[in-house]
Regions:
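Ligand-binding pockets and gating/stacking loops
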Residues: 1-198
Length: 198
């Protein structure tokens, strides 16, 4: 996966995604540069937008429209991202339900963040969970321990996400798709894992 999955595919580039990181700054470069006030930033984005619109009128390049919308989105995100990304303010009940922990990186935090994004009107949210490569080279990669733990963590978080969406009346207008792409053969390897299916 990685940055390649955040593109817009065959759609105009204005539809590409914004990657939220689980460690460090959630969205890179969201804050104003040092010594630049919010008003100065807003004025510079407005000036850039005007220049880009003139450029678009002349060249009709759809990537220019993308650039305009990205600058505008980035400015709007400066005020909303810090609050939305703050899962520490959620109740103890919610953290217990999801299995989330604001002080460490985990899939449950991302599931809780997904609910917060849906609440804010984000139209498409995609979660990834890594570490499913159960070849049995370690305890965390074994079928009887590692795979069971991974399933337990994701099952709890996804169940909580669906229940939380339902309790808040958001599930009626939210399509939840759960899928995977990493298949294994039914044959056991000579270690505690299974081989790739391709």
């Amino acid at each position: 996966a990685g940055k390649s999955v955040w593109g817009s595919g065959f759609l105009p580039s204005v539809y590409q995604g914004v990657q939220c990181r689980s460690d460090g700054e959630p969205v890179l470069f969201i804050n104003n540069p040092d010594d630049i006030s919010s008003d100065e930033r807003k004025a510079s984005i407005a000036a850039l937008s005007d220049i880009n619109k003139l450029h678009y009128d002349e060249f009709k390049d759809p990537d220019i429209l993308t650039r305009i919308s990205q600058y505008e989105l980035a400015f709007k995100m400066q005020t909303t991202v810090p609050e939305v990304m703050d899962i520490a303010s959620e109740s103890e009940y919610i953290h217990n339900m999801y299995g989330s922990n604001p002080h460490k990186s985990c899939f449950a935090n991302n599931a809780l963040l997904a609910r917060k994004l849906v609440e804010r009107g984000v139209r498409f949210v995609q979660l990834f969970d890594w570490g499913w490569d159960t070849h049995g080279t370690s305890e965390s990669g074994s079928i009887d321990i590692g795979l069971v733990n991974k399933c337990r963590q994701t099952d709890k978080a996804v169940t909580a996400l669906i229940l939380d969406l339902k309790q808040r009346g958001l599930l009626e207008e939210t399509l939840v798709v759960w899928g995977g792409e990493f298949g294994r053969t039914p044959m056991q390897e000579n270690r505690e894992g299974k081989t790739n299916s391709f």
